[in-house]
């Protein structure tokens, strides 16, 4: 089994509106594959308040 990890910090405040929806997408071309998101986290700081989501 091959395992890959993606970890990237992206400053979104300059490129997306205040309210957004985040999605995941993956492909293998013509072949079938199953992809799993085993965990994710989100952190936001707006005007001195902060919100976090860990799943």
Curated annotation (Swiss-Prot):
Tetramer of two alpha and two beta chains. This is Mannose/glucose-specific lectin alpha chain. The keyword Lipid biosynthesis does not apply. InterPro entries: ConA-like_dom_sf, Lectin_LegA_CS, Legume_lectin_dom. Belongs to the leguminous lectin family. It comes from the Eukaryota. The lineage of its organism: Eukaryota, Viridiplantae, Streptophyta, Embryophyta, Tracheophyta. Keywords: Lectin, Mannose-binding. GO terms for molecular function: D-mannose binding. It comes from Lathyrus sativus.
